[in-house]
Amino acid sequence: MTNSVKTNGPSSSDMEYYYKSLYPFKHIFNWLNHSPKPSRDMINREFAMAFRSGAYKRYNSFNSVQDFKAQIEKANPDRFEIGAIYNKPPRERDTLLKSELKALEKELVFDIDMDDYDAFRTCCSGAQVCSKCWKFISLAMKITNTALREDFGYKDFIWVFSGRRGAHCWVSDKRARALTDVQRRNVLDYVNVIRDRNTDKRLALKRPYHPHLARSLEQLKPFFVSIMLEEQNPWEDDQHAIQTLLPALYDKQLIDSLKKYWLDNPRRSSKEKWNDIDQIATSLFKGPKQDSHIIKLRECKEDLVLMTLYPKLDVEVTKQTIHLLKAPFCIHPATGNVCVPIDESFAPEKAPKLIDLQTEMEKNNDVSLTALQPFINQFQAYVSSLLKNELGSVKREREDDDEPASLDF
């Protein structure tokens, strides 16, 4: 069942209550500070606040978790966003020369939005999202997770629900935070393989696939039939199939034959059309060249699996160290959903809503008894692991610095 999208989100007093009683400031502080004790990583961190009036205030920074909580409560923004760690506190920006304030580091971030899958989802459209089309996001998370772990060696990353129709990935490994803008673009280029969102032409990816792409294909193939051909069934619409499925094939004779067959036999399901491709190709291509046609057809179908299911990233979010991104546990102003940490098993209806949390608090006045607590626990466990790894990294750096200089050539 499709979730309806509310246009009347939380009120100013709702947000005031949320920041005062429910928002996990301490865990967010420890995450961004990489230590329970205030350090440069938090004191020099930029925060931006967005208000229901349309105002947007950048270059806020906080000295402690108490200051963080007090300032957010006082300002009561609709949401706040997290930016880079600078060489000086961003709040001092007006007293500095423009060249004096420099961004040093920030988490490597990725953003996946359902909009980029609209050509292939039929269960919902626009701002709507349900558990069926959310599978596109879950698969994108799976592929990205594998690349981050196996290809880049990152350990400390977490996904956060955007509150409506997307997900954000925060990579907090020390190596990732220190990436330059050029290096961030290099990582992006590696992961963002399917750059062309144009569905009316063939991908024609080079063979052999890069190992990452070959691995991704094997991860995605088991889901293609159930998600694309059965649940979404986008190509049952004959014109849509002619516009987005046929251009992915390589042979004009095959394309013309399929087009005629589908117009003569309308409303065949996506699964039937997928099988039609093989059957008509077999009848057309016989003799000594049949094997080469079979190989080309298989490659076209592999490209289609990747075109439909491979992660579609919002590239601007990843490119720059200074880019700001909405903080975890913010409230989406339109839906009232909490932007909670998630994993591949998440579905959007699992996200707690502020209105429900307020009802739970009225009964118990205890955050630990609300639907928010399991997500806070999940985030706390992530932060604890990050701090442990951060401490280990600092110790290794100190040990390296303490090693005596060698006279060996």
From Swiss-Prot:
EC primary class: transferase
Bilayer-spanning residue ranges: none
Gene Ontology biological-process annotations: DNA replication; DNA replication initiation; DNA replication, synthesis of primer
Residue span of motif Zinc knuckle motif: 123-133
EC number: 2.7.7.-
Active-site residues from the entry: 46, 111, 113
Gene Ontology MF term list: ATP binding; DNA-directed RNA polymerase activity; metal ion binding
Family to which the UniProt record says this protein belongs: Belongs to the eukaryotic-type primase small subunit family.
NCBIfam families: primase_sml (TIGR00335)
UniProt protein name: DNA primase small subunit
Organism: Saccharomyces cerevisiae (strain ATCC 204508 / S288c) (Baker's yeast)
